[in-house]
């Protein structure tokens, strides 16, 4: 099986890059039956069965490479866990680095692993969307991903009809257009986190 997975948290602006890549990839292309698209979100260790089942694994994620925002880098095979753990931006990266290491320990690890990572611009805007430079990077990342999946026998074919909501691997009510259109104002919703879980003045 070929697995293409986007990881990250769409609630924290550019950290949602990986999930938005998978969302766009599925909206744009149909694939051969052996290709599995996964919205990995921040599930961490719960994703291990996808990794163990994959003969080839493609990962999309926002990665702090220390480069200009929007810069894409493609990392392969044994270097992938190192980059996921080098400059952790959130807990999901720690979790997915562990997923890869545990899959190796079980002896069920993909023959090939490729990470398409993008340098984020903004990570501290709760409820925010991708910045403009990241949206442009999604387009490039998706095409690079489709080319790779084609080489892996995934046979991407442009969709001739709109993807039905029930078929979406991402959460329909968090789809990019709707997410941006329905975001409440700063006055109505805190921009630095969920107020229900923030310390209150005594």
From Swiss-Prot:
Ni(2+) binds at residues 15, 61, 92. Keywords: Aspartyl protease, Hydrolase, Metal-binding, Nickel, Plasmid, Protease. CDD domains: H2MP_MemB-H2up (cd06062). GO terms for molecular function: aspartic-type endopeptidase activity; enzyme activator activity; metal ion binding. Signal peptide: none annotated. Gene3D superfamilies: HybD-like (3.40.50.1450). It holds the Pfam family HycI. One of its GO terms (biological process) is protein processing. Belongs to the peptidase A31 family. Absolutely required for hydrogenase activity. Mediates the attachment of hydrogenase to the bacterial membrane; attachment is a requirement for enzymatic activity. NCBIfam families: hupD (TIGR00140), hydrog_prot (TIGR00072). This is Hydrogenase expression/formation protein HoxM. It comes from Cupriavidus necator (strain ATCC 17699 / DSM 428 / KCTC 22496 / NCIMB 10442 / H16 / Stanier 337) (Ralstonia eutropha).
């Amino acid at each position: 099986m070929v697995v293409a997975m986007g990881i990250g948290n769409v609630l924290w602006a550019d950290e949602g890059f990986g999930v938005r890549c998978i969302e766009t990839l599925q909206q744009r292309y149909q694939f051969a039956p052996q290709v599995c698209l996964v919205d990995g979100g921040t599930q961490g260790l719960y994703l291990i069965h996808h990794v163990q089942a994959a003969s080839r694994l493609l990962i999309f994620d926002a990665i702090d490479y220390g480069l200009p925002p929007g810069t894409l880098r493609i990392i392969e095979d044994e270097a992938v866990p190192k980059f996921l753990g080098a400059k952790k931006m959130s807990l999901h990266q720690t979790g997915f680095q562990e997923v890869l290491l545990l899959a190796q320990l079980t002896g069920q690890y993909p023959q090939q692993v490729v990470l398409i990572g993008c340098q984020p611009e903004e990570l501290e805007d709760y409820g925010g969307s991708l910045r403009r430079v990241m949206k442009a990077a999604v387009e490039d990342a998706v095409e690079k991903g489709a080319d790779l999946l084609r080489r892996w026998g995934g046979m991407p074919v442009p969709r001739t009809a709109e993807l039905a909501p029930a078929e979406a691997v991402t959460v329909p009510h968090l789809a990019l257009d709707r997410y941006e259109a329905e975001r409440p104002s700063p006055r109505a919703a805190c921009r630095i986190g969920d107020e229900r879980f923030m310390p209150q003045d005594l």
